[in-house]
Amino acid sequence: MLHLQAAGMQVTFYNATMFPIDLLDGADAGTPPSQNSPLLQGLNDEQRVAVTLPQGHALVLAGAGSGKTRVLTTRIAWLLQTGQVSPGGIMAVTFTNKAAKEMTARLSAMLPYNVRGMWIGTFHGLCNRLLRAHHVAAGLPATFQILDTQDQLSAVKRLCKQFNVDEERFPPKQLTWFIAGCKEEGMRPKDVPVTDPDTKKKVELYQLYEDQCQREGVVDFGELMLRSFEL
């Protein structure tokens, strides 16, 4: 493992012993790229190191305003320009739609071709795209709908009413939190440890909620992530 640190940015490159040290200034064993590439103009030394690392796993830690988005998009453009990957081999994931749109716009300005073949988006957006493409294997209808937070709460309230659940003892909002927490931990109802009667009831309702969603062809945000993971 090689660790580089400078003001505002840290770069950790795993399995660095697989490559000669001189590759860290941008050379690639198969396709030697030019350090004079227009893509690298305006980058500082630390950003340039991060952009031109050889293929492998790298962790870049940087604070606010240090140019993380610029480094990431330039890294993608660099890999494409040097022929190390094809557009379909790129996946860039972020937390917000705004950041995803910014990355797409920057790459469109950098590259001479359409960037639609790349996988650029939020975690939920990319999971949605994956499940749409493989809905049969995922056990979903092609036209499955996504429940937002309010939709999910409404679905749980409907379930509680149907099965005469005591909503003072099991508030619907808390049930949605319980279900979301289980999914974040990768747990289906059968995987949830049952330690007391209340948890047992919550797990039963979780299973009923899953059955309801499956019948209606809908998924919540947690389901997008969990089903993609299972796929």
Each language-model region and where it sits:
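N-terminal pre-P-loop "Q-motif" helix
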Residues: 40-54
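Walker A/P-loop
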Residues: 56-74
